[in-house]
C-alpha cells in the first residue's frame, strides 16, 4: 500500500538550509507508513517569534520550540484524511543540530518524523510511552539512512 499524500509546505521564514518539499514528503511518508491510505498535512516553517507565540498560546511555554503538532480531529461521523499541522522553527532546529553535533538534514528529518508520530497519537509524557515513541523514531530515522537521533554523540 502506498500513501496518497497531500502535503502543503509553507516557508514563513528564510534560512541557510531548508529542506525541499520532496524531502519533507519522503520523511512524512516514512513516518506515517501504512497507518493511513490517504493523508493531508501542512508543514509550516516559522521563525522564533512565531514559534514562541504558538508555544505560549497552546502549551503555556513562553519560548520557541523545535516542533509543534496540531492533530486534526474530525467529528466521529465524518471521515477525512486530514492528519493535521506541524509547525517547525528553523532557528531552533539549526541550534539543536549544532549543539547535538548532527547534520541539519538529519535533525530536520527527525523533527518531521517526531511531529508526525505525535499527529498519529504517540506521546512521550509517560516513560513507557516515551520508550515506545523513541524506539519507533529511531527505526524510522535509521531507515532513512541517518543515525539514531537519541544516541549520545
From Swiss-Prot:
> What is its cofactor?
Zn(2+)
Q: PROSITE patterns under this entry?
A: UPF0054
Its primary localisation, in coarse terms, equals cytoplasm
Q: Name one GO cellular component term.
A: cytoplasm
Which EC numbers does the record give?
A: 3.1.-.-
Q: Name one GO molecular function term.
A: RNA endonuclease activity
Q: Where in the cell is it found?
A: Cytoplasm
| Keywords of this entry | Cytoplasm, Endonuclease, Hydrolase, Metal-binding, Nuclease, Ribosome biogenesis, rRNA processing, Zinc
Cofactor binding note from Swiss-Prot or TrEMBL = Binds 1 zinc ion.
The residue range of the signal peptide is none
Biological process GO terms, please?
A: rRNA processing
- Spell out the InterPro entries in the cross-references: MetalPrtase_cat_dom_sf_prd, YbeY, YbeY_CS
Q: What does this protein do?
A: Single strand-specific metallo-endoribonuclease involved in late-stage 70S ribosome quality control and in maturation of the 3' terminus of the 16S rRNA.
Family, according to the entry, reads as follows: Belongs to the endoribonuclease YbeY family.
Name-wise, this protein is Endoribonuclease YbeY
What organism, scientifically named, is this protein from?
Shewanella sp. (strain ANA-3)
Amino acid at each position: 500500500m502506498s500513501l496518497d499524500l497531500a502535503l502543503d509546505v509553507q516557508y514563513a521564514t528564510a534560512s541557510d538550509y531548508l529542506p525541499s518539499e520532496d524531502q519533507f514528503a519522503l520523511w512524512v511518508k516514512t513516518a506515517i507508513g501504512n497507518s493511513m491510505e490517504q493523508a493531508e498535512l501542512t508543514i509550516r516553517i516559522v521563525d522564533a517569534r512565531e514559534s514562541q507565540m504558538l508555544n505560549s498560546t497552546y502549551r503555556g511555554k513562553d519560548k520557541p520550540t523545535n516542533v509543534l503538532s496540531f492533530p486534526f480531529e474530525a467529528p466521529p461521523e465524518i471521515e477525512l484524511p486530514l492528519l493535521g499541522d506541524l509547525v517547525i522553527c528553523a532557528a531552533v532546529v539549526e541550534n539543536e543540530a549544532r549543539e547535538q553535533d548532527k547534520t541539519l538534514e538529519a535533525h530536520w528529518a527527525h523533527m518531521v518524523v517526531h511531529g508526525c508520530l505525535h499527529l498519529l497519537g504517540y506521546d512521550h509524557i509517560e516513560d513507557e510511552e516515551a520508550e515506545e515513541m523513541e524506539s519507533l523514531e529511531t527505526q524510522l530515522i535509521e531507515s532513512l539512512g541517518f543515525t539514531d537521533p537519541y544516541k549520545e554523540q
